[in-house]
Amino acid sequence: MKYTRKDSIIKRHRRVRKKVFGTSERPRLSVFRSNMHIYAQVIDDTKQHTLVAASTLEAEVKSTIKSGANCDASIQIGKLIAQRSLEKGIEKVVFDRGGNLYHGRVKALAEAAREAGLDF
């Protein structure tokens, strides 16, 4: 059986998740990228609880972007997730790229979150 691109992402994600673990002091910033949208969550893995979330499906974001599948949308989500995290008192996170390569939309989200004040 030939591996598809999706299979490769899933394999990489399993490898990454063995090493990346979020605590209450330093939660995990998880990124999921689909063909049409991008999603980001700040997760405390010890409590198995999502602390903060943002995606291109939200009304406030959707009205300001043309498409949820480009770097501009990722930059906005990165800024938004950082802003919401800082409001909740979360300054340090562990970045989980979700099996995707650190390139393009994932990289744009990460850099925007760093510029907005998150430390990782």
UniProtKB/Swiss-Prot annotation:
Q: HAMAP family from the xrefs?
A: Ribosomal_uL18_B (MF_01337_B)
| Annotated protein name in UniProt | Large ribosomal subunit protein uL18
Q: Which Gene3D superfamilies does this chain map to?
A: 3.30.420.100
| InterPro entries hit by this protein | Ribosomal_uL18_bac-type (IPR004389), Ribosomal_uL18_bac/euk (IPR005484)
One Gene Ontology term of the molecular function aspect = structural constituent of ribosome
Q: Quaternary arrangement and interactors, per the entry?
A: Part of the 50S ribosomal subunit; part of the 5S rRNA/L5/L18/L25 subcomplex. Contacts the 5S and 23S rRNAs.
Q: Give a GO biological-process term.
A: translation
Signal sequence annotation: none
Please give an example of a GO cellular component term from this record.
Answer: cytosolic large ribosomal subunit
UniProt lists the family membership as follows: Belongs to the universal ribosomal protein uL18 family.
